[in-house]
Amino acid sequence: MRIALGIEYDGNGYFGWQRQAEVDSVQAQLERALSIVANEPIGVFCAGRTDAGVHATGQVVHFETHAIRNEGAWTLGVNANLPDNIAVRWVKEVDDSFHARFSATARRYRYVIYNHSFRPGILRHGVSHYHGDIDADRMHQAAQALLGEQDFTSFRAVQCQSKTPFRNVHCVNVTRQGMYVIVDIAANAFLHHMVRNIVGSLLEIGLGNQPLTWMGDLLALKDRNQAAATAKPHGLYLVDVTYPEQYQLPKLALGPLFMLD
């Protein structure tokens, strides 16, 4: 049978999602826990591979198993065998047409900036700290140039392996909640480092170092070297993955938990 899971994790301390030799990863920990509960080797497929230090509240995975367990047994059993910084949020049996990556129609990320003169202590691994005077309204206005299907060469990592630089950004909003500035962006898919590269350039606009037209200018240039530095990983969360209604997957609060939805 094929099982889908919704999981959340704190990416701090992991070398990203993907299983790698000799370093710890979220995928390796999840597969280990699932294999214990299923009493057989389990391999998982995810909706989106996150980088080192990046978090998720809405990651979706699927796996194949011969084990017969109810949803409660999967949830409780796997959580009991996972580290405290990874948790299963929901479990659902799905038909064989479902694929966590290829069935997804959109991914949504939130990037959380702690905009204060002093660095955070408790949330140091859950937000990115920038101390300058950030104009969130200015960032939001500039970000609208990203909407639609466009060539995002200026915002892809040099090592990105995607065959095409084109992605379709469905929506992007930048808002302020007290000391926090949140960049909320959804697209059909994202290039390697695309969200963090976009945030890095939006910050330059929010700090007044670049004009409002800069995002559009960067898109036209199609040159990663012309854009700003990549934003830090700690503030980034994969918060939601969208699938066709036929799969009837659970929909939970987006998170992260310390933010108001």
From Swiss-Prot:
It comes from the Bacteria. Disulfide bonds: none annotated. Keywords: Isomerase, tRNA processing. It catalyses: uridine(38/39/40) in tRNA = pseudouridine(38/39/40) in tRNA. It is an enzyme of class 5 (isomerase). GO terms for biological process: tRNA pseudouridine synthesis. The keyword Transferase does not apply. The active site is at D51 (nucleophile). CDD domains: PseudoU_synth_EcTruA. Its EC number is 5.4.99.12. Pfam families: PseudoU_synth_1. InterPro entries: PsdUridine_synth_cat_dom_sf, PsdUridine_synth_TruA, PsdUridine_synth_TruA_a/b_dom, PsdUridine_synth_TruA_C, TruA/RsuA/RluB/E/F_N. GO terms for molecular function: RNA binding; tRNA pseudouridine(38-40) synthase activity. Transmembrane segments: none annotated. Substrate binds at Y109. Homodimer. Formation of pseudouridine at positions 38, 39 and 40 in the anticodon stem and loop of transfer RNAs. HAMAP family: TruA. Belongs to the tRNA pseudouridine synthase TruA family. This is tRNA pseudouridine synthase A. It comes from Shewanella baltica (strain OS223).
